[in-house]
């Protein structure tokens, strides 16, 4: 049975005022509508603290990627506001690193050159030797030093995603936005890169917002998990989607993949999220 006091599940209605005051990222009443009568989602509000890792889970079409694109400055909401570090987000910025499911590497450049391109965009006046040292540091963090002078066509899918992650970290953004970055990878590669990401985030204290469909991935990586529902027709008319519930992850932050299943709160937490996806993931 779900234990609210132990697993600290909070409904959106009971917002935490103290968190909103001190939060690094603040989303206020975000809505997106392609048709005025049927918004994809509405009244989406949540926060992220500096150094926090937050995952969002929901079925396809609920608007997760749209929210991430708004946070990245790549799309505009129909209404609402996004504030990061006290300033409203307006357009793309190197202060926010983005990693998509597709690697988006420039095929004619090597790993070194792909990441150096991003570094030079961030710091145009950085001397070439320093750029090279900087690039090598972040390539090493994702375990690709041996492939640094290879082109994308010479890399596996997992290696390409590692390059994308290294590139995002190399510009030292204030926030990292991940849109299902491991969704196209096999289970073994996905697990390996998840572990690498977890260690890098812990070492750098990076703030991360990540979309995933993988419940275990969210439980492993996230401090909090946002459960998002789809818009739906109801007897009272159409109700748009939104954030239905915010779940605080009660598991210790030093959790590991191998030890996850042995933690007392793992199965109650997992069962609650799965139950939401199966029975409550549409607006009522």
Place the predicted regions along the sequence by residue.
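Catalytic Walker B motif of ABC-type/P-loop ATPase nucleotide-binding domains
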Residues: 176-179
């Amino acid at each position: 049975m779900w234990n609210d006091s132990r697993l600290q599940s909070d409904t959106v209605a009971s917002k935490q005022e103290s968190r909103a005051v001190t939060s690094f990222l603040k989303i206020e009443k975000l809505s997106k509508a392609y048709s005025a009568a049927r918004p994809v989602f509405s009244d989406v509000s949540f926060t992220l603290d500096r150094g926090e890792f937050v995952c969002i889970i929901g079925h396809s079409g609920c608007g997760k990627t749209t929210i991430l694109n708004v946070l990245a400055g790549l799309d505009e909401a129909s209404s609402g506001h996004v504030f990061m570090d006290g300033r409203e987000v307006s357009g793309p910025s190197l202060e926010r690193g983005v990693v998509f499911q597709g690697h988006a590497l420039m095929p004619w450049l090597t790993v070194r050159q792909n990441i150096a391109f991003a570094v030079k965009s961030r710091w145009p006046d950085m001397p070439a030797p320093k750029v090279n040292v900087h690039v090598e540091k972040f390539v090493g963090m994702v375990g690709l030093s041996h492939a640094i002078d290879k082109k994308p066509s010479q890399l596996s899918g997992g290696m390409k995603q590692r390059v994308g992650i290294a590139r995002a970290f190399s510009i030292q953004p204030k926030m990292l936005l991940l849109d299902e970055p491991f969704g196209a990878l096999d289970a073994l590669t996905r697990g390996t890169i998840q572990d690498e990401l977890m260690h890098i985030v812990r070492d750098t204290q990076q703030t991360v917002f990540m979309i995933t469909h993988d419940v275990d991935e969210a439980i492993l990586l996230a401090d909090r998990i946002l459960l998002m529902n789809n818009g739906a027709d109801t007897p009272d008319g159409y109700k748009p989607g939104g954030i239905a519930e915010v779940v605080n992850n009660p598991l210790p932050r030093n959790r590991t993949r191998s030890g996850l299943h042995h933690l007392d709160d793992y199965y109650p937490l997992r069962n609650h999220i799965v139950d939401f996806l199966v029975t409550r993931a549409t607006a009522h």
